[in-house]
Amino acid sequence: MSVSAKQVKELRDATGVGMMDCKEALQETDGDFDEAVSLLRKKGQEVADDRAAVEADEGLVVTAVSDDGHAGAIVEINCETDFVARNEDFQSFADTAAERVLEETPDDLEALESLPYEDDVTIEEELVALTGRIGEKLTIRRFDVLESEEGQIISYVHPGSKLGVLVEVHGDGEAEETGRDVAMQVAALEPIAVTRDEVPDEVKEEEREVAREAAVNEGKPEHVIDNIVEGKLERFFEDHVLMEQAFVKDSSVSVKDMLDDADLSVARFTRYALGD
């Protein structure tokens, strides 16, 4: 069957699929637009099924923050190659998915995939269709949402969109600029907790065990080993606890000192590095 360029363009605009694939779909369905859309979705699912066992360890980390700053979402979406991670359609999908997560705060990935993407299409359906168009395995790996009635959610995404951070900031100071500094600190230095009290007991105990074993192996006197262990634990806190880290923009002060001067505090943070 002969199909017009107008029909092909309409199907292309509706699905984003390549012109030749749209033409073939219309020919196979005798020019029926709805049937052609359904056929293209089916082919997209076939591609997704074929690629299911393939590793997808490239992708993007994206964030979205509400207009009032009281909520933020962070999402990691994976693909097979960095080339696709730079694809405009893939990036647009990732940004839209983050916006939907922010709006709907789903409980899990299954609920996220059931959210509306646009019109009558769900996020899962759009992901399958995009898989068909791009030809790579695409997956939504994880997401998180921070909400705060009193605080501000500040986001930072490192250039390249492989690393992103959300930080919840409280206080009367200038939250936007300082919060971004803190988010960049979290991105760069990978703290595991805001304060030392939040470090899990098993982590502290493991650090003590490692320090004690090292001291014994070095032949340190028994009566000084406890002090050595606690000293190394203090240094561990300085390296891995946000409030005790040296501020990256001024290493002469700690992050806590910087925040105190700014009349701000940090309640929590979320850090996503691609593939972690």
UniProtKB/Swiss-Prot annotation:
Transmembrane segments: none annotated. Residues 81-84 are annotated as: Involved in Mg(2+) ion dislocation from EF-Tu. Belongs to the EF-Ts family. Associates with the EF-Tu.GDP complex and induces the exchange of GDP to GTP. It remains bound to the aminoacyl-tRNA.EF-Tu.GTP complex up to the GTP hydrolysis stage on the ribosome. This is Elongation factor Ts. GO terms for molecular function: translation elongation factor activity. Keywords: Cytoplasm, Elongation factor, Protein biosynthesis. InterPro entries: EF-Ts_dimer_sf, Transl_elong_EFTs/EF1B, Transl_elong_EFTs/EF1B_dimer, Transl_elong_Ts_CS, UBA-like_sf. GO terms for cellular component: cytoplasm. The keyword Nucleotide-binding does not apply. It is found in: Cytoplasm.
